[in-house]
Amino acid sequence: MTMKHFMALLLLGSAVTLQAQETVVKGKIDGISSGKLYLIAQTGEEKFDTLGCCDFKKSKFVLKAQVNEPMVAQLIVEGYQGGFRLLAEPGVSYEALLTNDSHSYIRGGKLQDDYESYMAYADSLRNVIDGVRTRYEAHKAQNKFRSASQANDTLRRSEQHLHQFTQDFLASHDDLITAYTFQTNALMKEAGLAESKRMYESLGAGAKAT
């Protein structure tokens, strides 16, 4: 219910129909020799549209889709769960390697490349934080108070660095990336209507227009 409120607000800026352009995703699907690939996007509170689809053979594919504005989409292999996030832009070509591990990537387009670079660095910071937290818990359990205190200080600094890095990244984007991040946060927090409105009003004009 709360997510519907936020999605309704987020979709207000999408009412203007723009000229669709061809967006192309070319690449390889690791471990699957043939099948059908779809590019799907949420275009309403409970509406999902297929932007494009293609058959693939020998694990290789070329998917062409009609996209009229930047949007968050998912590449989905028929018969398999999960998908691969794509910040799709009109008229942009992408290269992709779709796998079940960390080697998977989709490259091309400013939004996609910026977001993937952000996620890669943020994930590396989270790994550091997890390691420091493990050391802190170990020192604490062994009553090594000085070492635990030092680890705790490092942990707090690392968490603050990640928070500031995220804030700086979002501040540099008044576009789909910011809107997508706020939407994701609303989902995780199950924000109420008042909080959803506050989050929406904090978006810039560019993010609201996505």
Where are each of the predicted segments found?
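Bacterial Sec-dependent N-terminal signal peptides
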Residues: 1-27
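A non-transmembrane, solvent-exposed segment enriched in polar/low-complexity residues
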Residues: 21-164
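Serine-centered coil/turn micro-motif
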Residues: 109, 175-176, 206-210
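Amphipathic alpha-helical coiled-coil segments
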Residues: 156-173, 191-198
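Amphipathic alpha-helical repeat scaffolds of TPR domains
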Residues: 172-185
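Short coil/turn linking the two alpha-helices of tandem helical-hairpin repeats
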Residues: 186-190
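N-proximal helix/coil linker or "cap" segments that precede and/or mark the start of modular domains
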Residues: 193-210
